[in-house]
């Protein structure tokens, strides 16, 4: 029975009535029960949509997020089996988000209006409201507004709105029919987080989107019903657009860690996509990446990202001169902010992975980026003051003149909006480059003099303490080697790195032994500590001696190099590090080769061991198989004896069963003929002769009864038929006369109508002939032209068809030849196979004939032995009879009757008969 029809207007009217009497919760519950009921499973989308819309309106008003979630999933469960249902699911999700956003906008507007009114009241009485209690309350409220809001009602609605967005995203996720709706809800959720500054919610949103993408990838490999196909370009483009938007919002909210993770997601999707992203989208990607690298302090990749961005921005037809000036100046400053080239390091450089985000094959160098910043397409659009600053620090850097030039230029640069963020790295560059130049020109300098040389107006001002910090940092980075004497406030520079490193090594003084003798009378704890210090000093001395020895060897090799002798301290350190890295790589290579040799020998040894184990296992298996074969042979021998005994018993039972089965079959055939019916239970007591006799008797009886009945029926039928004909003859004559009259009347009527119709038709045709006779000549001309045209066309078609016919004949001839060849090959193959089969059959027949002849020979021998045995027994009986005194002669033992031979038949034996014959022969043996 079909479920009752669902009427949405009744449910909505019932909900409105409950709301009107102040029971909105009951109205919501009634709609939820209707959505969860069994009737809703069979309803279509058009019927349920008004109900779910009303349900969502009430749920949003009452802030019942959990019930809304359950209702949405119930609706999706009912509708997800058809394309129309999925379209309705998307419409319901969009309606839900519209309701949420509208409600949130209204709440925010009411709150803003209330705050404005409170602000006006506070301005009227500025002092009256300031009390200790109010101050404490305000402080407490500020502590509670970490999320950005101090209104409980607004916060509750914000939480509800966020939960609604999250529910909707989970409701729409990973369904190919809902991709567009899902993408729209994702963008609206990001706008919500940005509008209300919800940083924590945005982090959760980003993590949720990653989980959805992972789940889509997992489901794509296992399921196939409406799953998201990431190989589809449109789908992948939508996911890429979501991640680009995610990066933009992350940067706007200054969530740099989340922005970097989003950048990695974008880069991964761009690699999967076969479509190249739009230049505007790619430019936005590089701009955000530059901001992220700047915040992380990676000025090298920051400048590389600006270079990528600027190269794309040059192709923008809508860009203005002011935009070019801003971005070119930004690129020049980012290139200047890069730290001086790093020294070579051993091991993996973590920045290589970051370079992959910029589609760079290798780590960029400062020199290349400075060259790119000095190209004509950048210089001609950059700010003039920025170019002057660039020339001072890069092109024509001079410590003595740089101070005066920068002092005059810095006030103009401070006014630039893009200069403020690069103050710290640019000041660091200027100070470090100045320190390096001073270290090249002088071996020592007074700290005050150096401070005066590097002091610049704001924002490049520098204190003595900061100067010492910069000196130490430069020394730690191996740009210079310094020693500061605070008594004289002098800074000394070392020119050779080996001298500085050897001086820094710890040396154990020779007086350590004498100190131990002087302190021999100290306490036990003091002596133990001294002994431990001596051991530690001895280890340090040994290690330092080894390091000093290696450095000495390395210095001898490098000092023979002319470039090393003429280079600066920084260049010498670079050469030393390159040489050390080269040597370390050689050592690692040798160790790797040795490890490979050891691994190879271990593998060979393991292989030999496995082969020996295989040989032993094979021998054990052969021995076990031999024992099992012996045991099996013994068991088979006993089983054969038991089988022979059982076979003899079974043979007798089978003889009886075969006889009974044959009789039942014969009885069934006899009963099927319908002549006589015999009970199958009597099969044991009947023979074929008895059954045939019963059938013959029954057939004779039936034939006799039939003859008697036929004779009686023929006599009865003859008299009855004669009486019928005598009675119907006058009636037939009367009917014939009446029929003749009716036929004559019908003929006259038909003839009259035919004459009238023919006259009318003749008149119409005569009028038509006279009308057409006027155009007969024109018709003949048109007919002749059409015939000529069709004749020409017919000739062309005939020629074309003849050509096609000839071509078809050739193809058919070739096909017939090929088919005959294949048939001949198949015939020869079949003949070969038939000959082989015939030979095999002849061989089998010869084998059977040999076995049959051998069996007959054995049977003849046995019969001969039995005959001789009977003769011997008869002779013995005769002897015994003649020697007895009793008048009654003894009856001789009758000879066993010969076995009844079956009638010879040309019909081949069945499988059961062959098995029976085999068992009988075995029993005789």
From Swiss-Prot:
It is found in: Cytoplasm. One of its GO terms (cellular component) is multi-eIF complex. Residues 112-121, 839-880 have a biased composition (Basic and acidic residues). It comes from the Eukaryota. One of its GO terms (biological process) is formation of cytoplasmic translation initiation complex. Residues 916-925 have a biased composition (Basic residues). Residues 324-498 form the PCI domain. Residues 534-666, 785-885 form a coiled coil. Keywords: Coiled coil, Cytoplasm, Initiation factor, Protein biosynthesis, RNA-binding. PROSITE patterns: PCI. Residues 108-127, 509-544, 839-925 are annotated as: Disordered. GO terms for molecular function: mRNA binding; translation initiation factor activity. The keyword Cytoplasm applies. Pfam families: eIF3a_PCI_TPR-like (PF22591), PCI (PF01399). PANTHER family: EUKARYOTIC TRANSLATION INITIATION FACTOR 3 SUBUNIT A (PTHR14005:SF0), EUKARYOTIC TRANSLATION INITIATION FACTOR 3, THETA SUBUNIT (PTHR14005). RNA-binding component of the eukaryotic translation initiation factor 3 (eIF-3) complex, which is involved in protein synthesis of a specialized repertoire of mRNAs and, together with other initiation factors, stimulates binding of mRNA and methionyl-tRNAi to the 40S ribosome. The eIF-3 complex specifically targets and initiates translation of a subset of mRNAs involved in cell proliferation. Component of the eukaryotic translation initiation factor 3 (eIF-3) complex. Belongs to the eIF-3 subunit A family. This is Eukaryotic translation initiation factor 3 subunit A. It comes from Kluyveromyces lactis (strain ATCC 8585 / CBS 2359 / DSM 70799 / NBRC 1267 / NRRL Y-1140 / WM37). The gene is TIF32.
């Amino acid at each position: 029975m079909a479920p009752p029809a669902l009427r949405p207007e009744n449910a909505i009217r019932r909900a409105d009535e409950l709301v009107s009497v102040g029971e909105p919760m009951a109205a919501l519950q009634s709609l939820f029960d209707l959505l969860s009921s069994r009737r809703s499973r069979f309803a279509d989308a058009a019927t349920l949509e008004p109900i779910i819309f009303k349900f969502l309106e009430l749920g949003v008003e009452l802030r019942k997020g959990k019930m809304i979630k359950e209702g949405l999933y119930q609706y999706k469960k009912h509708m997800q089996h058809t394309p129309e249902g999925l379209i309705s699911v998307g419409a319901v999700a969009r309606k839900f988000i519209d309701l949420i956003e509208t409600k949130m906008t209204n709440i925010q507007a009411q709150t803003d209006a209330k705050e404005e009114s409170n602000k006006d009241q506070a301005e009227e009485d500025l002092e009256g409201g300031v009390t200790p209690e109010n101050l404490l309350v305000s402080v407490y409220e500020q502590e509670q507004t970490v999320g950005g809001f101090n209104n409980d009602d607004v916060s509750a609605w914000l939480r509800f709105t966020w939960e609604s967005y999250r529910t909707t995203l989970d409701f729409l996720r990973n369904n190919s029919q809902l991709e567009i709706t899902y993408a729209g809800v994702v963008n609206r959720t990001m706008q919500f987080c940005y509008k209300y500054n919800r940083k924590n919610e945005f982090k959760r949103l980003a993590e949720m989107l990653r989980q959805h993408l992972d789940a889509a990838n997992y489901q794509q490999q296992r399921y196939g019903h409406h799953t998201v196909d990431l190989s589809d370009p449109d789908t992948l483009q939508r996911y890429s657009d979501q991640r680009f938007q995610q990066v933009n919002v992350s940067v706007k909210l200054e969530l740099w860690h989340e922005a970097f993770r989003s950048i990695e997601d974008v880069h991964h999707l761009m690699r999967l996509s076969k479509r190249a992203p739009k230049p505007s989208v790619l430019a936005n990607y590089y701009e955000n990446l530059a901001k992220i690298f700047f915040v992380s302090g990676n000025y090298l990749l920051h400048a590389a990202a600006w270079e990528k961005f600027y190269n794309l921005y040059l192709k923008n037809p809508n860009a203005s001169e002011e935009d070019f000036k801003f971005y070119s100046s930004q690129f020049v400053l980012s290139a200047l902010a890069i730290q001086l080239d790093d020294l070579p390091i051993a091991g993996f450089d973590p920045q290589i992975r970051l370079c992959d985000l910029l589609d760079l094959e290798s780590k960029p160098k400062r020199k290349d980026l400075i060259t790119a910043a000095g190209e004509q397409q950048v210089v001609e659009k950059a700010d003039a003051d920025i170019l002057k600053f660039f020339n001072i620090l890069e092109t024509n850097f001079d410590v003595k003149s740089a101070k005066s030039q920068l002092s005059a230029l810095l006030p103009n640069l401070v006014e630039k909006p893009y200069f403020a963020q690069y103050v710290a790295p640019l000041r660091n560059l200027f100070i470090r480059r100045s320190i390096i130049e001073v270290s090249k020109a002088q071996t020592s300098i007074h700290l005050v003099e150096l401070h005066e040389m590097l002091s610049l107006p704001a924002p490049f001002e520098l204190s003595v303490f900061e100067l010492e910090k910069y000196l130490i940092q430069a020394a730690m980075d191996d740009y210079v080697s310094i020693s500061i004497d605070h008594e004289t406030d002098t800074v000394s520079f070392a020119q050779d790195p080996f001298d500085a490193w050897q001086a820094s090594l710890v040396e154990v003084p020779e007086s350590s032994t004498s100190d131990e003798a002087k302190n021999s009378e100290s306490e036990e704890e003091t002596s133990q500590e001294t002994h431990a210090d001596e051991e530690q000093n001895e280890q340090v001395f040994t290690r330092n001696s080894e390091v000093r020895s290696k450095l000495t060897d390395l210095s001898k090799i490098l000092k023979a190099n002319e470039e090393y002798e003429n280079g600066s301290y920084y260049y010498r350190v670079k050469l030393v590090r390159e040489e050390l890295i080269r040597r370390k790589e050689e050592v690692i290579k040798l160790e790797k080769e040795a490890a490979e040799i050891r691994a190879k020998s271990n593998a060979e040894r393991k292989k030999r061991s496995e082969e020996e184990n295989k040989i032993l296992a094979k021998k054990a298996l052969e021995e076990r198989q031999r024992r099992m074969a012996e045991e099996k042979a013994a068991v088979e021998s006993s089983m054969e004896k038991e089988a022979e005994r059982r076979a003899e018993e079974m043979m007798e039972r089978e003889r009886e069963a075969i006889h009974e089965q044959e009789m039942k079959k014969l009885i069934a055939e006899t009963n099927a003929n319908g002549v006589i019916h015999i009970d199958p239970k009597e099969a044991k007591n009947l023979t074929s002769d008895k059954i045939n006799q019963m059938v013959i008797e029954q057939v004779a009886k039936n034939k006799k009864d039939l003859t008697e009945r036929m004779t009686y029926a023929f006599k009865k039928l003859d008299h009855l038929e004669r009486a019928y004909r005598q009675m119907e003859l006058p009636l037939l004559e009367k009917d014939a006369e009446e029929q003749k009259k009716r036929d004559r009347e019908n003929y006259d009527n038909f003839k009259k109508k035919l004459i009238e119709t023919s006259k009318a038709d003749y008149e119409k045709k005569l009028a038509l002939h006279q009308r057409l006779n006027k155009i007969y000549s024109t018709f003949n001309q048109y007919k002749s032209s059409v015939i000529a045209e069709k004749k020409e066309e017919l000739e062309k078609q005939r020629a074309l068809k003849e050509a096609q016919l000839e071509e078809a004949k050739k193809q058919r001839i070739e096909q017939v030849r090929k088919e005959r060849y294949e048939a001949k090959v198949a015939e020869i193959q079949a003949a070969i196979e038939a000959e082989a089969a015939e030979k095999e059959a002849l061989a089998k027949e010869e084998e059977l004939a040999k076995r049959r002849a051998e069996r007959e020979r054995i049977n003849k021998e046995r019969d001969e032995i039995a005959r001789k045995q009977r003769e011997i027994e008869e002779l013995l009986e005769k002897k015994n009879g003649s020697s007895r005194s009793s008048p009654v002669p003894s009856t001789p033992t009758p000879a066993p009757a010969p076995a009844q031979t079956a009638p010879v038949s040309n019909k081949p034996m069945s499988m059961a008969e062959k098995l029976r014959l085999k068992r009988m022969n075995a029993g005789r043996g």
